[in-house]
Amino acid sequence: MLRSGPASGPSVPTGRAMPSRRVARPPAAPELGALGSPDLSSLSLAVSRSTDELEIIDEYIKENGFGLDGGQPGPGEGLPRLVSRGAASLSTVTLGPVAPPATPPPWGCPLGRLVSPAPGPGPQPHLVITEQPKQRGMRFRYECEGRSAGSILGESSTEASKTLPAIELRDCGGLREVEVTACLVWKDWPHRVHPHSLVGKDCTDGICRVRLRPHVSPRHSFNNLGIQCVRKKEIEAAIERKIQLGIDPYNAGSLKNHQEVDMNVVRICFQASYRDQQGQMRRMDPVLSEPVYDKKSTNTSELRICRINKESGPCTGGEELYLLCDKVQKEDISVVFSRASWEGRADFSQADVHRQIAIVFKTPPYEDLEIVEPVTVNVFLQRLTDGVCSEPLPFTYLPRDHDSYGVDKKRKRGMPDVLGELNSSDPHGIESKRRKKKPAILDHFLPNHGSGPFLPPSALLPDPDFFSGTVSLPGLEPPGGPDLLDDGFAYDPTAPTLFTMLDLLPPAPPHASAVVCSGGAGAVVGETPGPEPLTLDSYQAPGPGDGGTASLVGSNMFPNHYREAAFGGGLLSPGPEAT
C-alpha cells in the first residue's frame, strides 16, 4: 500500500489499491442514488468480490441509516431494502426487490384458518342426556347367573309405555363422525371407575361404544343395556383391567382400599370423542347420569306398599293397622301420615317389622281432634338414610266418637210397648205360636183349599155308589175338623178322584193273580191276555178280626205292579206279592 502525503500533488496510484474514503466518497454518492433495480441486482452479485464496493455500501448505510430502523418503505415503491445483521456478517447481506403485498382471499379469511381453526367464542360441541336412566327397579346380576342382565329403562317409563336412556350431540354439525363411550363410575366424587360392567348390545370389556353421525342422526337410545356385578374378591382385578384399557374419564385412578366401593349404586358416564380437521383426537367433557340403584339391596331398593288392612280410623289415633310391603330394613324405615303442612309418624318398634315385609303400627293422632267431617291423608313409607319415599295410599281420619259406650244409641231405641201388647187380643202370643207350628204329613199334600196341582180333599172320599160304609186308607184319611167337613165345603163331582186316576196308569205286566171272594176262596192263576180296567167285583168290609188295614202294592202312593183286575183282591185287601 502506498503512502500519499499532501506534497505528492498530481501523483495518482496505478495499482488496484483500496481508495481512501476522501477520494472515493464524492463520486460514490451520486452513482448510488442513480441506481435502479437491475443495477442493484448486479451489485449484489459483486459484493463478495470487491472490497471497495463493500466500503461504499457501508458508508451509504451509515449516512442514510437505510434499513436499520426497521421502518416501512417510503413512497418510492420498488427501492431495495437492506437488512443489517451486524458488521461481522456483512458478507451475507443480499439485496432484492420488495415482494408485493398478498391479495386477500375472496372469502374474507386467510387460508391458514381452514387448516387450524382457532377456538372462537361460539358454542363448542358437547353431549347432553335427554332421557335419564331409571334410578330404581333394575337388578344387578352376576355373570354366573347365566342369563341376560335385563335392560335399563328410561326415567319416564310406565307399565303402558317403555322408554330407554338417550343422549344427543349438539353443535356438532361440522363433524363427520363422533364416537360415544359409556362406562360405570362411582356415585360420589371423584367418580372413580366402578368394578361393575355394562353388558348388552355394543358392549365389550365392560363399556359400551357407539359411532354416530351428527349430520344424519345426533340422537341415540341405548337398547338392551344391562349392569353386571362382580364379587368382592374380583373388585381389584376388574378395576385394574379397566384402567389398563384407558377407561378413566375423570383421571381419578384406582384405590388400594376397595372397601369404600358402594356395590349397590353406580352412575353411567357418557363421553364423546372426535377427530378435528387436522386429524387430532379431541374429547368432549364427560356427562354423568343420575344414580342407578340395585333392586335386590334393601338399602337402596324401591319402596312399595302392597296393602293396608284398614283405610280409615279415628282422628284421635291409636288405631292398629297391618301393612304389607316389599323388603325393608327394620332399623331404616318409617311410616308417615301426611296432608298439606301436617305430617305425623306411626308408632312402632323394630320388633313390629315381620320378616322385612310386614309392619304392625298404630296411627298417629290428627292435628285437629275436633273435625266434624272425614279428612283424607296420604300414608307412605320413607327410608331414613336417603329420604326415599314410596307411592302414597289414602287413609281417612274420622271425627271423634263422643258416645263410645253407645248410651245415646240405646236411648234412641226407646222402651218396649208392654201395655199395648197386654191389651191386644193375643196377649200371650198363642196365635203367633200356632202359626209357627210344624206342618203335619198331609199338609205337604194339601197345603190349601184352593185350586192347584194337589187333589181336593173330596177326592179321597169313597164313591157312595160302590161303598156302603166308610173306607179308610192308612195314611190317607180325610182330615177332620170343621175346616174340611163343614157344610160350606163345596164338592166338585167333575174333579178327578183317586180311582179315576188309577185307570190312567199303564197296563201291568203279566203275572199271577189271586182273587178272594166272600162266598169261598179259590185261587186262579193265569196269564192276563191284555190290559183290563180295574173293576170293583166285590168288597168285604173289614171285620173285627182284621187289622182294618189296606195295603198299597208297590212303593209310595201308586203301585208299580198291581194284581188282577179284581179291586178287592188287588188294591184293598192284603195278599201275597206276585213272584
Curated annotation (Swiss-Prot):
Q: Where is this region: Disordered?
A: 1-39
Chain span(s) of sequence motif Nuclear localization signal: 433-438
Supply the alphabetized keyword list. Activator, Biological rhythms, Cytoplasm, Cytoskeleton, Disease variant, DNA-binding, Methylation, Nucleus, Phosphoprotein, Repressor, Transcription, Transcription regulation
Q: Which residues carry this modification: Phosphoserine?
A: S37, S573
Domain RHD, chain residue ranges per copy: 125-440
Q: Where in the cell is it found?
A: Nucleus; Cytoplasm, Cytoskeleton, Microtubule organizing center, Centrosome
One biological process term from GO is:
antigen processing and presentation
For molecular function, the Gene Ontology terms on record are: DNA-binding transcription factor activity, RNA polymerase II-specific; identical protein binding; protein kinase binding; RNA polymerase II cis-regulatory region sequence-specific DNA binding
| One GO CC term on file | centrosome
Kindly provide the PTM information from the record.
Answer: Phosphorylation at 'Thr-103' and 'Ser-573' is followed by proteasomal degradation.
Q: Which residues are modified to Omega-N-methylarginine?
A: R16
Q: What induces or represses this gene?
A: Up-regulated by mitogens and NUPR1.
Relay the domain remarks: Both N- and C-terminal domains are required for transcriptional activation.
Q: Which disease is it linked to?
A: Immunodeficiency 53: An autosomal recessive primary immunodeficiency apparent from early infancy and resulting in recurrent infections, severe autoimmune skin disease rheumatoid arthritis, and failure to thrive. Immunologic workup shows increased CD4+/CD8+ ratio, impaired T-cell proliferative response to multiple antigen, T-cell developmental and functional defects, and impaired ability to produce specific immunoglobulins.
Which function does this protein serve? NF-kappa-B is a pleiotropic transcription factor which is present in almost all cell types and is involved in many biological processed such as inflammation, immunity, differentiation, cell growth, tumorigenesis and apoptosis. NF-kappa-B is a homo- or heterodimeric complex formed by the Rel-like domain-containing proteins RELA/p65, RELB, NFKB1/p105, NFKB1/p50, REL and NFKB2/p52. The dimers bind at kappa-B sites in the DNA of their target genes and the individual dimers have distinct preferences for different kappa-B sites that they can bind with distinguishable affinity and specificity.
Q: How does it assemble?
A: Component of the NF-kappa-B RelB-p50 complex. Component of the NF-kappa-B RelB-p52 complex. Self-associates; the interaction seems to be transient and may prevent degradation allowing for heterodimer formation with p50 or p52. Interacts with NFKB1/p50, NFKB2/p52 and NFKB2/p100. Interacts with NFKBID. Interacts with BMAL1 and the interaction is enhanced in the presence of CLOCK.
In Swiss-Prot or TrEMBL terms, this protein is called Transcription factor RelB
Naturally occurring in which organism (per UniProt): Homo sapiens (Human)
